[in-house]
């Protein structure tokens, strides 16, 4: 490809924090996360076992226990800081929705919570964010331990984590009310979209009164329908809806989550994955694409399709004109077997470039150092190819986006 450098038209300046990342709450507290592939599975010499339905919930067979991350590790801090200064660090994920903030040392979480976050664990993460020159985005606890579906959300837990973060000198600078609320069954028992709208409005009112400087991000949607509709409208070949695990399980629509809300969000956020990984292939074969497709136009087009699909939602429901992809990865359910190899570099760099031409905003790679889609290998923190690609992107590409005419 030969570019006419003199004739390039500037589109925009990108958010300098575009290449941000996630630290899962389960990494902070210790808990279950997607089971790592074996070296033989990564090399294609061993089949990934299908989900075990005998346990009732087949997802349980795809998970393994991970101990709390050593966020003080010098190697982790050095590598995370090298990605770029001033990035967002998102601490969220499915576990965050049911995490009790045990900052008073009670020793156990009340009934209705799944796990607990100690004061020491949270301070360690705050110190990590400070050490890497980062900015903190979190999502809130919203589960049966806090309130029932027919009871309004209350700020008892939010007050704890916002106060401690501010007191420690690493304030929460942006927040999503609930991680992936489309999957209502994973929030509060009996929860509805109307309950979510009620509670997000209550939270945003509380935020405006107590922490008006904090950016309201949401709805953190993982809805597959917008991308499917966009693909149909543009006459493309049908693919996954981009929602990852949400493509497999029941979910409500983004419109249901936001239509009727009285408090407008500042920045619209969504999650994007190129379908599901080998772990979940048996549950939804049509949402899986093999390694042979990893450099295909169809596979690489998914990031741009997802961003384009959400531009109208950004314009309708938010005020600041940015899209934030608060989880992004090669595949839902922990990433593909090739997510930790050089084959993933194509998707990573392609996503950065396509996204930048479509909208200003931020992409939060999932994850920094957990499971097979992590920039760094869990435990050892050894960098993977997509990590080096992202570091080089930030060193070489700059913040100006041009229309190449291609």
Regions found by a protein language model. Name each.
Residues 341:
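Ligand-binding pocket segment of bilobal, Venus flytrap-like solute-binding proteins
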Residues 264-274, 279:
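Aromatic-lined glycan-binding groove of carbohydrate-active enzymes
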Residues 275-295:
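Active-site His/acidic residue clusters
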């Amino acid at each position: 490809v030969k570019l006419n450098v003199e004739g390039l038209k500037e589109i925009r300046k990108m958010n300098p924090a575009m290449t941000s990342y996630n630290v899962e709450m389960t990494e902070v507290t210790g808990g279950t996360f997607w089971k790592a592939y074996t070296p033989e599975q990564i090399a294609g010499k061993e089949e990934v076992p299908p989900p075990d339905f005998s346990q009732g919930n087949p997802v349980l067979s795809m998970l393994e226990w991970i101990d709390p991350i050593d966020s003080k590790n010098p190697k982790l801090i050095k590598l995370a800081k090298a990605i770029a200064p001033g990035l967002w660090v998102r601490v969220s994920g499915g576990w965050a929705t049911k995490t009790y903030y045990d900052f008073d040392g009670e020793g156990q979480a009340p009934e209705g919570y799944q796990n607990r976050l100690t004061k020491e664990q949270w301070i360690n993460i705050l110190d990590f964010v400070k050490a890497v020159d980062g900015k903190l985005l979190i999502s809130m606890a919203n589960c049966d331990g806090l309130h029932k579906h027919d009871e309004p959300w209350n700020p008892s837990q939010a007050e704890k984590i916002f106060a401690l973060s501010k007191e420690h000198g690493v304030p929460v600078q942006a927040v999503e009310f609930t991680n992936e609320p489309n999957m209502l069954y994973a929030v509060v028992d009996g929860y509805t979209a109307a309950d979510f709208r009620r509670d997000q409005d209550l939270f945003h009112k509380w935020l405006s009164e107590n922490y008006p400087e904090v950016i309201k991000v949401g709805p953190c949607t993982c809805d597959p329908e917008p991308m499917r509709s966009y693909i149909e409208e543009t006459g493309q070949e049908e693919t996954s809806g981009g929602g990852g695990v949400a493509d497999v399980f029941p979910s409500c629509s983004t419109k249901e989550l936001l239509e009727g809300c009285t408090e407008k969000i500042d920045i619209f956020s969504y999650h994007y994955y190129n379908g599901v990984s080998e772990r979940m292939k048996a549950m939804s074969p049509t949402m899986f694409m093999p390694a042979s497709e990893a450099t295909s136009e169809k596979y690489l087009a998914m990031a741009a399709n997802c961003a384009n699909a959400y531009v109208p939602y950004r314009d309708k429901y938010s005020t600041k004109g940015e899209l934030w992809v608060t989880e992004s990865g090669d595949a839902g359910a922990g990433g593909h077997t090739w997510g930790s190899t050089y084959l993933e570099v194509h998707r990573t760099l392609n996503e950065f470039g396509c996204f930048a031409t479509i909208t200003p905003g931020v992409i939060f790679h999932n994850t920094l150092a957990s499971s097979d889609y992590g920039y760094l290998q869990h435990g050892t923190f050894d960098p993977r190819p997509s990590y080096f690609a992202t570091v080089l992107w930030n060193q070489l590409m700059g913040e100006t986006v041009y229309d190449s005419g291609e």
